[in-house]
Amino acid sequence: MTGLQMRGHAAMLLFSILVAGSFIFGVRIANLAEPAAINSARFIIAAILIGIYMLVNPNIKTADFAPLRFKPWRYLLLSSVFVSYFIFMFEGLKTAATVSSSVIFTLIPIMTAVLGYVILRHIITRRMAFALLIGSIGAMWVVFKADISNLLVFNVGKGEMIYFVGCVFHAAFIPLSRKYNCGEKPIISTFAILIVGGVIMAIFGYEGLLAVDWLNMPAIFWTGLLYLGIFASAVTFFLIQFAALALPSGKVMAYNFLTPVWVILIEVALGLGWPPLLVSAGIILAVIALLLLLKDETKIPV
């Protein structure tokens, strides 16, 4: 494994932790404003933060922005794909059950691996396929809290189908990011995607933005929004752009398997108690899957 690949894995490990934190904060502020307003604001905050960072960073030169002039439509495409995930998520979650949507989310690594082959011809080895399979099973086991009764209420309705389409967009973003990178530094491409994505989200959620009483929102709202904007948007977008250039698509999104695990550990740290002991079986499967994916191989494809 090369140093770049090791940094790619480290980036996605941090990514999975930060995304887990976004679920914790997201639950606490979800009912305080329209989802479209919250996500529009997080894009704007993230873009401003990265813009300031690039402005004061002596290592970012004017010449680094030159590749953006080459086929600028790439960023309209990439931003539209990523924002589409949020739009379909908003619509789908209006009627989709929480458990059902969580299960669909755990399928993103498999979707990403398949789309990585279609778009980039990234080979899916037997080891990778096996790791993705047991990782999905482990993540679902955690989502269902090792309770068969939760599995029995799983239902695929209109909301679930809409959310599934959104997850396909999410999965496609990784291989498309690599395909349409023309030499930009990850921080530059992240900034461009956030700017264009922020405009698209603002157009989609302008009614929600205008409806929020920004000056009188509680402290927890601003704490959660700043976390989402800084850590779950600016930092995670950069991490995923960096990892997409260092690792195969399936390996990048496989770190989503760890997100339910981190959510549990964060909840325990907050004093919300441990889940049933049987849930640990799912955690073990997720860890095994990631260990299998750490091995770099180019042997017989599936």
Where are these regions (language model features)?
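C-terminal-most transmembrane helix of multi-pass membrane proteins
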Residues: 10, 43, 221, 257-302
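Transmembrane alpha-helices of multi-pass small-molecule transport proteins
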Residues: 32-84, 111-112, 169-176, 190-209, ...
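C-terminal transmembrane-helix exit sites in multi-pass transporters
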Residues: 49-54, 108-133, 261-281
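Specific transmembrane alpha-helical segments of multi-pass solute transporters/efflux pumps
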Residues: 18-23, 57-101, 105, 141, ...
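Glycine-/small-residue-enriched transmembrane alpha-helix faces in small-molecule transporters
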Residues: 1-41, 88, 152-179, 199, ...
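Helix-helix packing/entry segments at the starts of transmembrane helices
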Residues: 39-41, 99-107, 176-199, 230-269
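Hydrophobic transmembrane alpha-helices of multi-pass small-molecule transport proteins
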Residues: 50, 124-146, 201, 257, ...
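Juxtamembrane helix-entry segments on the extracytoplasmic side of multipass membrane proteins
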Residues: 4-8, 32-36, 40, 66-71, ...
